Amino acid sequence: MKIHEYQAKAILARHGVPVPQGEVVSNATEAREAAKRLGGGVVVVKAQIHAGGRGKGGGVKVVKSPDEAETVARQIIGMQLVTHQTGPQGQRVQRVLVEQGLKIKRELYLGMVIDRSTERPVIMVSSEGGVEIEKVAEETPEKIFKEFIHPTAGLSGFQARKLAFALGVEGASVNQAGKLMAALWAAFNATDASLVEINPLIVTDEGNLLALDAKMTFDDNALYRHPDLKELRDFAEEDPLEVEASKFSLNYIKLDGTVGCMVNGAGLAMATMDIIKLAGGEPANFLDVGGGANAEQIKNAFRILMSDSSVKAVLINIFGGILRCDILAEGVIAAVKDLGVRVPIVIRMEGTNVEQGKQMLRDSGLNFTTADTMSEAAERVVAQAK
């Protein structure tokens, strides 16, 4: 689950991470009043959406007066902000963060994620703040420094000092950086976060460290332990089809292609998308119905697939284990009849009751195309999607 910048900063501040003073507002008048309360001087008006690249898209503006803050907020609130992470359709801005302006001496990077190879949290720092860490990793990987955190021992003082020296901070800022990293770990650990990122972490002219921007995402599987975090979820920022799929325990992610995919198992789903691309097509989605899906879930999955107007053909790739092939066939047949599906459907299934499932498809009187291998299925569905 993602949250907004202002929400992430509030969580980090509660755990001791220093952040700039600011207020989130939903209209231009409130922006002017917020700017007044922040001293009436230089403030930054920042669009709040679940995407990076807001500045380049025109969603972050520095202003010098409350009146200018009102004018800029009126321009930003309600705009369809397009960034490299939103796609060409953009994301509608519903609120802005009005934040105190600061004199910046240096911009650094500080982040924390789960490292899958070591199965431990890893804290990362870089002197190259203000740019995407992926770009730094690609172009100047030697400027990224990491420390792996033992999940029970936590972040050690010597690790924090080592990273502070790697950043090139000096004097009292070393201890300040150490305390900030400890606070970041506390927030990460306490909230079951999957990512915490401060980019940039700034050093002011006075030598103070502050989180100028913040991003947090959380493990959905742990949200039952954090009802307070669940309340921060902004459904307006999420794809409506993804929200609908989550109601039926379906893992759905919308993509930009024309071949709809329905698969059981995340690994098989990713392999299916790969083989569609190898066949010259583009997947329209990632859809994992899970190993124990029933006919009703299959029907709901189909309904969600068909809600995407870009889908020109559907590939169903199922390995029948807990989800038997006859149950799959029952759900698919019911969905196609009830929803009046008109796009071509290619089905490849193997496993429990596969012959029974294939016979049900043949007896349905519906125009399904079957395939025995993944490559055959991909070639057929790509041809029919053109």
Q: Where are the language model's segments positioned?
A:
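ATP-dependent carboxylate/acyl-activation modules
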Residues: 1-197, 202-316, 326-328, 337, ...
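Short amphipathic alpha-helix used as the core "switch/output" element in two-component signaling
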Residues: 333-334
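Catalytic core of bacterial c-di-GMP phosphodiesterases, primarily the EAL and HD-GYP domains
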Residues: 321
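Short internal beta-strands
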Residues: 342-350
